[in-house]
Amino acid sequence: MPRRRRGPRCDPSSALAVDVAAAVAAATSRTRAQKVRKAKKVLAANGHKWHRRAKTPVNKRTLVAARLLAGVRCHNRFYGALVSSFETAYCMNHRHGSDGLAATIIAEACGAVPVCSLNTTIMFEVNLGGRRPDCICVLDRAGVAGAPRESVCLIVELKTCRFSRSALTESKKNQYATGLRQLRDSAKIICDVAVPGADFVHIVPVLVFVAQRSMRIMDVRKFNERVVRANAELLRLRLAALGVYSRSFAAAPQRLQSAQDRCHDHAATPKPTPAVVPSPPAPPNPAPPQSRVGFGSALAMATAVMLGEYARENKPPR
């Protein structure tokens, strides 16, 4: 192999060395830019994306998988936070209501009612065959035994958002359309699998948008509900058997009013203003005061007068 000839050596501090180094750097930078442009074209043709910071190609499938894993982690965190919210609401047993995830979601279906006044069964990842809703809550009030009751089957579909500044992004629009289809199909399947009965079951689909980092509820959208005549207890048992995890909470009994509640009611109830009763006008010529001498006093006075007269008449002579 022939030996490569070397050029003349020069001092690194000389002007020639500085110019040569600048030329080499410029040529290298131009070559780098050309390579980057060519790599971008090749990656775009193959369905890949160029990462600006790392200057390395990133596969779109890898990004989608990473975002999917982040959504799964957020779902699991939301499930734990929702169960903790129900536990707190039932442990507090406060009749003035409570705040949190449980109260926010139940308010969409049942209105502003205390969470602890309902019999609640919450189920996660319910496998309905065609669909797999994230969460289903069966709510009913404690009514008279043997009488038809009204239950609420709340279907919750969770959508996690990485950025919570704007709700009009393309990804959120796609999530809304996807969630609407999922809720519609889930409600139809539940209506089909419900066992006919005498109870009234309100099927309420709800779409919830949650921020991934702060777990803050960004938006809750309720869609048209359906009312079916079914056996609410059998429907609850069937959905609980199809879920990956289920938890039941019994309605709290009516407790005696504590001193704190009485103080709360006393402070909340406005005090009535006493009515001013006008005093009657004084008569122009007041009557003279009447004597208050009773019958016994009059008899004693008459007896004393008679005894005095008798003593004077029978007075012995001197």
From Swiss-Prot:
Primary location class: host cell
Any one GO BP annotation for this protein: symbiont-mediated arrest of host cell cycle during G2/M transition
Disulfide bonds: none
This protein's name: Protein UL24
Segments forming a coiled coil: none
Biased composition (Pro residues): 271-289
UniProt gene name: UL24
Subcellular location: Host cytoplasm; Host nucleus; Host Golgi apparatus
